[in-house]
C-alpha cells in the first residue's frame, strides 16, 4: 500500500483489534537476493512485472499502491527504495529490512519469492542467503 496510507491504516486496525501498534502485525514483501544489486533488480523486475500484471492488476490490487496526489504507481526503483520490495545483495537487503523495521512495527514477514518465475537455482540461492545471512543480521 502507498506509504501515505500505512500509518493511518495500521493505527485503525490496531485500535479495532485492541492491540498495540505492531503487535501481531505481519507484512508481505517481495524478496530477491543476488550477487549484485543489478542482478537482483533484473530478476525482480522480470518476475514481479509478470506476476503483478497477470495476478494482481486485473483485480485492482495496484490501486493501493498509487500515489494519491499523482495517480502514478511507483517505478521499480521507487518500490525498492521505499522498501515495498527487498531486492539486492545481502548487505542491501539487510539495510532495507532494518529500515523497514524502524519505519513499521512488524512481528513477522512473509517472503514472496516468485516461485517458478525466478530461475530455480537463483531462487534457491536467494532463499538461502535470506535465511542464513540477512535474517541473522536483521531478523
Residue ranges and their predicted role:
Residues 1-139:
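Active-site-adjacent structural elements that line small-molecule/cofactor binding pockets in enzymes
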Amino acid at each position: 500500500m502507498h506509504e501515505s496510507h500505512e500509518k493511518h491504516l495500521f493505527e485503525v486496525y490496531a485500535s479495532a483489534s485492541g492491540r498495540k501498534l505492531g503487535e501481531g502485525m505481519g507484512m508481505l514483501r517481495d524478496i530477491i537476493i543476488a550477487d549484485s544489486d543489478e542482478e537482483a533488480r533484473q530478476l525482480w523486475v522480470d518476475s514481479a512485472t509478470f506476476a503483478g500484471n497477470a495476478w494482481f492488476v486485473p483485480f485492482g490490487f495496484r490501486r493501493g499502491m498509487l500515489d494519491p496526489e499523482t495517480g502514478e504507481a511507483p517505478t521499480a526503483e521507487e518500490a525498492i527504495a521505499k522498501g515495498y520490495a527487498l531486492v539486492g545483495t545481502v548487505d542491501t537487503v539487510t539495510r532495507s529490512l532494518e529500515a523497514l523495521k524502524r519505519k513499521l512495527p512488524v512481528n513477522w514477514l512473509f517472503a514472496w519469492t516468485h516461485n517458478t518465475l525466478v530461475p530455480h537455482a537463483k531462487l534457491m540461492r536467494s532463499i538461502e542467503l535470506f535465511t542464513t545471512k540477512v535474517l541473522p543480521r536483521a531478523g
